[in-house]
UniProtKB/Swiss-Prot annotation:
BP GO terms, sorted: defense response
Function: Probably participates in a plant defense mechanism. Has anti-HIV activity.
Record flagged with keyword Cell membrane: no
Organism: Leonia cymosa (Sacha uba)
Keyword Isomerase: no
Name under which the protein is recorded: Cycloviolin-D
Sites of the Cyclopeptide (Gly-Asn) crosslink: 1-30
Keywords: Disulfide bond, Knottin, Plant defense
Record InterPro entries: Cyclotide (IPR005535), Cyclotide_bracelet_CS (IPR012323), Cyclotide_sf (IPR036146)
Length: 30
């Protein structure tokens, strides 16, 4: 539920490496 400060409109979340995932075009973690 915390935003990772990254969007995922055109590319995947680079922050997925630290547990972030794409939701509503923004990367979130928990």
């Amino acid at each position: 539920g915390f935003p990772c400060g990254e969007s995922c409109v055109f590319i995947p979340c680079i922050s997925a490496a630290i547990g972030c995932s794409c939701k509503n075009k923004v990367c979130y973690r928990n």
